[in-house]
Amino acid sequence: MSGSRVRIGIAGLGRMGARHARNLALRCPGAELVAACSPVAAERAWAKDELGVGTTYADYPSLLGHPGLDAVAIVTPTSEHASNIIAALDAGLHVFSEKPTSLLVADCLRVEAAAARRPDRVVLIGYVRRFDASYRDAFAKVRDGAIGTPFMVRSQTIDMNDPSGFFVRFAPTSGGIFCDMSVHDIDAARWFLGGAKAERVFATGTVAIHEGLKACGDLDNGVALCEFEGGKVAMFVASRTAAHGHESMTSVVGTAGRLEIGANPRATRVEIADAHGVRSECTPTYYERFEDAFIAEVNAFVAAVCEGVPLPVTLHDATEATRIAVALQRSIAEHRAVDV
């Protein structure tokens, strides 16, 4: 497709879908957002009025049949990702999908098989940290031997407490805190550890504030350990109850040094010095922290479609992230270490 714009349709216009739609329409020169799909009439109207999307649909099969479509961006509920990806591939389309591929390893493998039948189609699962400038710089340093051989990763995702209860309502279909939040940390750990194969995991946690999570067996704070082949290890921390804001931090330890990404979650380079001391404001949410990476992600997808530019994450990577996250959720449920 070299030299032409990729005609993309987006499925899902909720909180994250609207952000992806805006990026595709306004911040991705190689793409043309030609269609959108949502069962919610107000969301379809927003896509037309705010982004100038010419055609909207209430159902996904109709979107797949849009004339001249090259690709789809899937930002539907996680439980629908795998079937949506496979249907798009069967329709001959390139696919970008939000993470994870699925909450079931078997469905991830079905997606891999469907993609193998269409090697001429690009499929990208949105593990956005692989497109973040700081994470990419850190990976290049690790790859080039700056800290020797990496053997340990500590990675955390911490969100500001949301008293509205949004994620409590979302929790029953999220797969749990490790599938929803820590899956980014899991993918980052495998990336920095050279795609190492996980062998055993253990997870624990608590409900510190949001009692409603107990109804579906979820947590608002969790910690996990993962043992990889060759003696490599990773620790993951997830929290939904921070008072200060969003924090994504990854530490990689090697035989000759250590590096950290995001150790200070400051929103800007401004510091305030007053009677309370010296302080800086924190990044409020994950989107402010990774907004540029989300833009880079969709542009990388378009470059892969148009020019065959290699992508930094594979379907196998996405499957392994799900495999580890699911094992962590099982560890929570069974109160024991679990083989992966």
Residue positions per predicted region:
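Predominantly a Rossmann-like dinucleotide-binding segment in NAD(P)-dependent oxidoreductases
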Residues: 121, 129-216, 335
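Residues forming the Rossmann-fold NAD(P)(H) cofactor-binding site
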Residues: 18-21, 82, 183
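C-terminal helix-rich "cap/oligomerization" subdomain common to oxidoreductases
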Residues: 1-5, 71-74, 300-340
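Beta-strand-loop-alpha-helix segment that lines the small-molecule cofactor/substrate pocket
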Residues: 2, 66, 71-130, 145
